[in-house]
Amino acid sequence: MVAGTRCLLALLLPQVLLGGAAGLVPELGRRKFAAASSGRPSSQPSDEVLSEFELRLLSMFGLKQRPTPSRDAVVPPYMLDLYRRHSGQPGSPAPDHRLERAASRANTVRSFHHEESLEELPETSGKTTRRFFFNLSSIPTEEFITSAELQVFREQMQDALGNNSSFHHRINIYEIIKPATANSKFPVTRLLDTRLVNQNASRWESFDVTPAVMRWTAQGHANHGFVVEVAHLEEKQGVSKRHVRISRSLHQDEHSWSQIRPLLVTFGHDGKGHPLHKREKRQAKHKQRKRLKSSCKRHPLYVDFSDVGWNDWIVAPPGYHAFYCHGECPFPLADHLNSTNHAIVQTLVNSVNSKIPKACCVPTELSAISMLYLDENEKVVLKNYQDMVVEGCGCR
């Protein structure tokens, strides 16, 4: 960790160790960080304390260590679209009721690419068949899978458009119950999903593989992977085999293949917080009365992940508005200070006995944010994190 980042961590240490994990980098901290980086002397905690601080931050994100993804790590467009949809960004994809249902029961979405070295299966007449194995060992044991889908890309074929025709294929997805053996070159399989598709458009096809993934993760069954079978219903084999992209073309570069290669997506819940939801801009509940400048209220605070050197593994957002609470809780407590009965009594006692502390200005309402990041295994994860944004402050 570079010296500048350690200076920043030292400035942020009190906020996290004292439980104020809603924000990381206040404007004051930015100025101090700039000064510390330019050589101004400042007291710094020990390396052990800084390491403990970073571990606490990572623990808050459910990580055991800081991810260090390679430059070749790929973020599937599907996951980026999913993030935009659930973060409510302008220009996000149109609503997808199937995805909304899946996300309504999950707070974590994970994506997996298959291991290409295990693709080949014997060809059969009129069919293209591949075995796909996805390593799901990075899914935490406490995460319950609520649904899973296999994404397969199909390309629009110019022959179909030029002839105003529609060549059809049937895509069958099987779970491998028992792998092929020396005595049997074909594995024992169970049909999971099937669909009839044509060549008139380029799009992703989604197949429900929830039963298989739940057996592997929740019931302890062995994961032998899937068989994807494309049945060519027309005779033009040379064209149709290139239509459904279940394997990489001979001269296709790594980047273009990474954008359309098959993808397994799991939706799960770790029992913490609420499911993913589309974040909408909140409206003010009521007009705020004129307050004293020093009274308890919400203040701006922007968290920039690049300031702590985490922008290499956090894909989106680059930062977020966390806000923080600060200000006086004077006697008598006004209605707009959103106080509890206990805070009112405590403030009353403080007015006659200074040994009793005043009520504190703290967050009274918090909301979640969605984060898209690369985990320790370079798997792309979309997760909902609770209590990250201060929505309201009060005296408590």
Curated annotation (Swiss-Prot):
Gene Ontology terms: biological process: ameloblast differentiation; animal organ morphogenesis; aortic valve development; astrocyte differentiation; atrioventricular canal morphogenesis; atrioventricular valve morphogenesis; BMP signaling pathway; bone development
Record key words, sorted: Chondrogenesis, Cleavage on pair of basic residues, Cytokine, Developmental protein, Differentiation, Disease variant, Disulfide bond, Dwarfism, Glycoprotein, Growth factor, Osteogenesis, Pharmaceutical, Phosphoprotein, Secreted, Signal
PROSITE patterns assigned to the protein according to its UniProt record, in alphabetical order: TGF_BETA_1 (PS00250), TGF_BETA_2 (PS51362)
Keyword RNA-binding: no
Localization: Secreted
Signal peptide, first to last residue: 1-23
Short name of one Pfam family: TGF_beta
Propeptide, chain numbering: 24-282
Modification sites for Phosphoserine: 87
Glycosylation site positions: 135, 163-164, 200, 338
Entries under InterPro entries matching the protein: BMP2_TGF_beta-like (IPR047953), Cystine-knot_cytokine (IPR029034), TGF-b_C (IPR001839), TGF-b_propeptide (IPR001111), TGF-beta-rel (IPR015615), TGFb_CS (IPR017948)
GO molecular function, one term: protein serine/threonine kinase activator activity
Major subcellular site: secreted
Domain of life: Eukaryota
Disease field: Brachydactyly A2: A form of brachydactyly. Brachydactyly defines a group of inherited malformations characterized by shortening of the digits due to abnormal development of the phalanges and/or the metacarpals. In brachydactyly type A2 shortening of the middle phalanges is confined to the index finger and the second toe, all other digits being more or less normal. Because of a rhomboid or triangular shape of the affected middle phalanx, the end of the second finger usually deviates radially. Short stature, facial dysmorphism, and skeletal anomalies with or without cardiac anomalies 1: An autosomal dominant disorder characterized by short stature, facial dysmorphism, skeletal anomalies, and variable cardiac defects. Distinctive facial features include midface retrusion, short upturned nose, long philtrum, high-arched or cleft palate, and variable degrees of micrognathia and dental crowding. Skeletal anomalies include patterning defects of the axial skeleton, characterized by 11 pairs of ribs and brachydactyly of the fifth ray.
Role of this protein: Growth factor of the TGF-beta superfamily that plays essential roles in many developmental processes, including cardiogenesis, neurogenesis, and osteogenesis. Induces cartilage and bone formation. Initiates the canonical BMP signaling cascade by associating with type I receptor BMPR1A and type II receptor BMPR2. Once all three components are bound together in a complex at the cell surface, BMPR2 phosphorylates and activates BMPR1A. In turn, BMPR1A propagates signal by phosphorylating SMAD1/5/8 that travel to the nucleus and act as activators and repressors of transcription of target genes.
Protein's name in the database: Bone morphogenetic protein 2
Underlying gene: BMP2
